Curated annotation (Swiss-Prot):
It comes from Thermococcus onnurineus (strain NA1). Pathway: Isoprenoid biosynthesis; isopentenyl diphosphate biosynthesis via mevalonate pathway. The active site is at 62 (proton acceptor). Belongs to the AcnX type II small subunit family. It catalyses: (R)-5-phosphomevalonate = (2E)-3-methyl-5-phosphooxypent-2-enoate + H2O. This is Phosphomevalonate dehydratase small subunit. Heterodimer composed of a large subunit (PMDh-L) and a small subunit (PMDh-S). Keywords: Isoprene biosynthesis, Lyase. GO terms for biological process: isopentenyl diphosphate biosynthetic process, mevalonate pathway. InterPro entries: PMDh-S-like, PMDh-S-like_dom, PMDh_S. Component of a hydro-lyase that catalyzes the dehydration of mevalonate 5-phosphate (MVA5P) to form trans-anhydromevalonate 5-phosphate (tAHMP). Involved in the archaeal mevalonate (MVA) pathway, which provides fundamental precursors for isoprenoid biosynthesis, such as isopentenyl diphosphate (IPP) and dimethylallyl diphosphate (DMAPP).
Length: 130
């Protein structure tokens, strides 16, 4: 399955998906030292985003969330790529400063955790292995 979106941050990544169907706050919602989702309201609470392709509808919360994304990258606990339904400033800024490929305009309800994907962010393309 190929899904077409829009490039936010260029680059390529391939890996296992971790998908949340709920908005995600990085400040207080993801531990920057471990990559574990800690948000009590998250449907992926307790799971690690480190080294995976992270998909969720949109970000929420404080602007400091951008720096949490950057800290994840510096600590080697960042996702390989980010896929969102709607890019908002907090997550987009974090992906930009961390250099994490990011695509928006993707219907994340079509994605499932555990699937393997290729993100070709320069083309705004997400390819899901079937």
């Amino acid at each position: 399955m190929k899904l077409k979106g829009r490039k936010i941050v260029g680059g390529k990544a391939e890996g296992e998906l971790i998908v949340s169907q709920k908005p995600l706050s990085f400040l207080g919602g993801v531990d920057p030292n471990t990559g574990i989702v800690t948000d009590a309201e998250s449907d992926i609470r307790g799971q690690s985003i480190a080294g995976k392709v992270l998909a969720f509808p949109r970000g929420k919360g404080s602007t400091v969330g951008s720096y949490v994304i950057y800290a994840l990258k510096k600590n080697g606990k960042a996702p390989k790529a980010i896929i969102v339904g709607e890019a908002e400033t907090i997550v987009a800024t974090g992906a930009i400063i961390a250099g994490i490929p990011m695509v928006d305009g993707i219907d994340v309800s079509k994605l499932k955790s555990g699937q393997r994907v290729r993100v070709k962010a320069d083309e705004g393309l997400v390819e899901v292995e079937e």
